């Protein structure tokens, strides 16, 4: 068995993680107390054509028949963890995997990174115990926001320890990136830059989403006038469900955890990917509208479907692209859809990389949580792509960082937690280089020029 352990950190990471596990349980026929719904495995076997035990990669099955998520939830203060402990799925998780401190990190990266050594050790101990229940650990899926102190600082400290202890295991990271128009804290640009710099060597691939993009999707495509974090997390969870479906269900063209960085990351530093999901439709619209595989594929490349805000994606080029299809989809239909995209020349790839699409198909259709604003459909798809337009994402946060750091605003809060001012300049320089890297990768002579220089 190739197990995956998910680690949910901070308020955003824990709330998103809880939504993901709610959806996973529905998809696998597991009730909120961890018991399996009668005949749920047989139903999955009919769809996949065999005995479906792949879900054990994400769930540990106990001797009493209960299924426990291979998941750790950690926050520096108890509010969100207490909500999970008293919520509908309180009986699902292992009690020792719901970890919290007593005081939050005050939206301060430095405090989150260095101020919680006992909590860090407790979390690493829980991870160690979780790995001992694995027969062949693939790696880790980490959920966090980089705007807050815990999500940025504590995540960086934890990933440093994970990289040291589990060096050869794959580490994937789903990051909620700061949105200037939906900011929850003025120092978010500091935390985002410091976290990205600190995590650069510790994560193999990062999936980027921001609340502003999800907010717009909820408004335009679902008609939710004032979306809450509840709506946003449900939508992100649906995308994460599609990304992990090949790990949790038996099916054709399965994607292994290690294949994400292999197929998405051309160079170790440039490991930041954007996501899109389709279709996002209301239950009323789903009854009237069924997209073909060709239409589904085309909608993935619509800028309005992207879950990260780019000023103009058409100014950049694709370096790599993974598409995960679910439900009533055949390999032939996918091949025809991809061929159609290539012929239209509307999806530009960099000249130094072959125009290749990594496609995965899973026959298990997506599931909608009862009462949610979006509907489950017969077929759906999710795209993850490494695109040179990511330079625009880093440019925005770098500019906002500079506006504050030029006046040394709020820097004393970080210095008071043990940081030095030069750590800000080092991190900012690193993000500038990352921004330039992504911009230069759009130039078709990038690799040729580098190889000529090397010779």
Swiss-Prot record:
InterPro entries: Alpha_tubulin (IPR002452), Tub_FtsZ_C (IPR008280), Tubulin (IPR000217), Tubulin/FtsZ-like_C (IPR037103), Tubulin/FtsZ_2-layer-sand-dom (IPR018316), Tubulin/FtsZ_GTPase_sf (IPR036525), Tubulin_C (IPR023123), Tubulin_CS (IPR017975). Its cofactor is Mg(2+). It comes from the Eukaryota. The keyword Endoplasmic reticulum does not apply. Mg(2+) binds at residue 77. GO terms for cellular component: cytoplasm; microtubule. Tubulin is the major constituent of microtubules, a cylinder consisting of laterally associated linear protofilaments composed of alpha- and beta-tubulin heterodimers. Microtubules grow by the addition of GTP-tubulin dimers to the microtubule end, where a stabilizing cap forms. Below the cap, tubulin dimers are in GDP-bound state, owing to GTPase activity of alpha-tubulin. This is Tubulin alpha chain. The gene is A-TUB.
